[in-house]
Amino acid sequence: MIKREIEICGKMVPFRSSATVPRLYRAKFKRDIFKDLSKLESSYTGKKSEGREFQIEDLEIFENVAYIMAYHADNTIPSTIEEWLDQFEMFSIYEVLPQILISFNVAHP
């Protein structure tokens, strides 16, 4: 199990990854987290090197993964992604995503 706090908009947000996360993700979103993470990592690498933005689908995957990991760390957070995201100002996906990918050992530092 990996626990880590990531700063988002000046607030330390706990995240947790463990063998339970894929089950939580599948139950909530009816999707395979490993396929989504692989797609997200590929998209992140390509977009970053090309200086381009993420597509909406990629952003949704990022939000879903971040939410599930945050919920796994603290199940008192809001019950919807929208409510959870509303507590933050705008933030850069490029600052948060690498830390989440590293937590799942999808990307290497």
What are these regions (language model features)?
Residues 21-29:
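Covalent nucleotidyltransferase core used to form phosphodiester bonds in nucleic acids
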Residues 16-18:
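Short linear motifs in exposed loops
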Residues 1-12, 31-52, 60, 72-109:
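Charged interaction scaffolds used for protein-protein
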